[in-house]
């Protein structure tokens, strides 16, 4: 979470503080002092660091296929909320239908809303729930 949410170099938000609207080839494409990292090789539309999206879907939202069930035939949803973000909404359109993992901070608890088109194992605050297709709402204490 810290690398994702930090605004100083190196981080994913650092380029945004310098005006980026795409993913740069180098985290310091434009350095703190405003100079270019190098004038010879600076791509400002380079997906190499875009793998953070995989981390957001697979960890922050917790959406993953269950081992032994390719193509999201059965899924695991184990979200990892963080107070610094406060809320997250991710969805993935699988061949079986929409998978959605939302969480948000509500007072002193987390509210999770999980939608699954297939059987799923949903893990919230260490507790596993085996569920059928549908939309499920869970709550857990903020730690």
Describe these PLM feature segments.
Residues 1-143:
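Non-catalytic C-terminal accessory modules of carbohydrate-active enzymes
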């Amino acid at each position: 979470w810290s690398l994702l949410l930090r605004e100083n170099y190196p981080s994913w938000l650092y380029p945004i503080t310098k005006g980026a609207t795409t993913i740069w080839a180098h985290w310091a494409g434009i350095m703190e002092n405003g100079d270019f990292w190098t004038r010879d090789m600076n791509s400002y539309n380079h997906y190499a660091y875009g793998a953070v999206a995989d981390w957001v879907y697979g960890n922050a939202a917790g959406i993953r296929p269950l081992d032994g069930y390719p193509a999201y035939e059965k899924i695991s949803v184990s979200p990892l909320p963080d107070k610094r973000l406060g809320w997250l909404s991710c969805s993935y359109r699988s061949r079986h239908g929409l998978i959605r993992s939302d969480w948000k901070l509500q007072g002193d608890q987390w509210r999770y809303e999980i939608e699954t088109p297939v059987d799923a194992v949903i893990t919230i605050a260490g507790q596993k729930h085996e569920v059928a297709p549908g939309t499920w709402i869970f709550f857990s204490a903020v730690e």
